[in-house]
């Protein structure tokens, strides 16, 4: 049940990321056209909207990256066995959980700071942008906990190691 939820959530995030890329084209295109032609007036708010969308795109991409385990790795040791690899994954995952906690806690403070403020040009509540940090931290925590569970099961001898691509299809 938890895997089904995380799979659904990962798919939702992927859809949101693709949608935000498509939506980002609108304010950026308006800004370009208004800068080089007299056909439309200069829209000052488009730069701010593009920046806000870009922030969300980066955060959603980071969430998906943790789910897929697509962050970079540096191989220091030669090929290790399944249990040793799982132990190293658990150790590395602890650091990712630490960063998730920092994003969650500091992001919440960041959001509270912006709660009653609005952006200058687009007149949007700033908490809508700042809430990306705690949501990212919480999402990292959920996705990384799932990955840690898989590594713990391999370490305990209850499961075989999964290839990264198969990890995503585990709930299907």
Describe every region a protein language model picked out.
Residues 1-172:
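Alpha-helical transmembrane segments and membrane-interface helix-loop junctions
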């Amino acid at each position: 049940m938890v895997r089904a939820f995380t799979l659904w959530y990962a798919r939702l995030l992927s859809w949101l990321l693709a949608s935000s890329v498509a939506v980002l084209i609108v304010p950026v295109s308006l800004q370009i056209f208004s800068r080089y032609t007299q056909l439309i007036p200069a829209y000052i708010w488009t730069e701010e909207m593009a920046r806000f969308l870009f922030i969300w795109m980066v955060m959603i991409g980071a969430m998906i990256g943790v789910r897929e385990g697509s962050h970079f790795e540096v191989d220091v040791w030669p090929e290790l066995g399944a249990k040793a690899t799982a132990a190293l994954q658990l150790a590395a995952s602890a650091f990712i959980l630490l960063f998730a906690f920092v994003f969650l806690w500091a992001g919440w403070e960041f959001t509270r700071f912006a709660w009653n403020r609005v952006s200058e040009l687009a007149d949007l509540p700033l908490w809508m942008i700042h809430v990306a940090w705690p949501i990212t931290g919480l999402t990292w925590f959920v996705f990384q906990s799932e990955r840690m569970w898989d590594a713990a099961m391999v370490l305990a001898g209850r499961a075989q190691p999964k290839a990264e691509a198969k990890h995503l299809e585990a709930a299907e």
